[in-house]
Amino acid sequence: NDVFTGGMEKERKAVLRMAQKLGDKLYAHGYRGAFCMDFLIDTDTGEVYLGEINPRVSGASPMTNLITSTYGGCPIYFFHLLEFMDADWEVDLSQVQKRWAEFDNWSQLILKYPHDKTEMITKAPASGIWQMDDKGEIRLVRKSIDWFLVSGESEAFYLRVYTGGDYRYKGADMGILVSRGRMQNDNRTLTE
């Protein structure tokens, strides 16, 4: 997932319209709290399709909360909690969306185990801030569970999902990498 400004503007507007329409409909039918929607964009035609709806947080939720809470807003989870606390609150959604329209570039990569076999993990990298030097070598700078501490494009946060003694299997999420900047260029190929 690359989260960046200026990309796919027409498609982004279509996603916003679809999400707003569905959210309004769910609210009218009594649904309260946060939910996540995944959209698929055909980058050849510009068509936008609804991929799935999750009545919970999803793999993209951390990125969404990173953007909303870092750039002068409240985490979306805060609004979720307000709904379930029966708090009396109001928000101007257009102002919130306007504030969140400009932000830094962030990327998230979910690392999956691709092989069709089950194996015990003997050793796994630690969660924390990792840094790449000029030679392309990476090292753990500090253990952490907070990706807000990523300070530049030479650093990334790695969240370890499984550790030594756990089992890996085909499709298992092995870890999540969050970095500043984009991991793909406009041609959808990985950056250096």
Predicted segments with their positions:
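ATP-dependent carboxylate activation and anion-phosphoryl transfer catalytic cores
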Residues: 1-192
